[in-house]
Amino acid sequence: MPELPEAETIGRALKRALVGRRITEVRVFSPAMREPLTPLLDAELPGRRFVDVRRRARYVIAELDDGRALLMHFGMSGVVRVEPADVPKRKHEHLFLVLNDGRAFRFECTRRFSVCKLCRLPEPGGCPPELDGLGVEPLTDRFGGEYLFRVSRGRHGAVKCFLMDVCAQ
């Protein structure tokens, strides 16, 4: 299962590959995932342009020019690729977005535990409401020794469990 560093790396790579690119064609091969891919993607995504890609927790948010975003979580076996559009379809490829530069964004998952869904953003650069319950982002100034000290008061238990719980709030 990709952890935060992998999600950060994937987000940075997708930012370089997608920002400024326009979606020209959409194919949903297999909508059965942890959260089913909607057939509406076929009608709603062509013509949209990627304006930003960022990470929040272990999610990658690929923001579009219409106030929506593709929200991705890679689960245990999710993979994204941006490669030439003429590369043959792989067995576990679920979503295929052809870009205006001749490449394609491909979302694959062998176990179908991943998430790739279209969601509305409350504001440009924001996070989808689905992520409102997540804790403090560990790569920001808000997260540090002082924060951990404050939230650890009155708690007893294993350090790893505490950290996992704090990071999930």
Task: Pin down the residues of each PLM region.
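A cross-family signal for N-terminal binding/gating loops and helix N-caps
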Residues: 1-108, 112-114
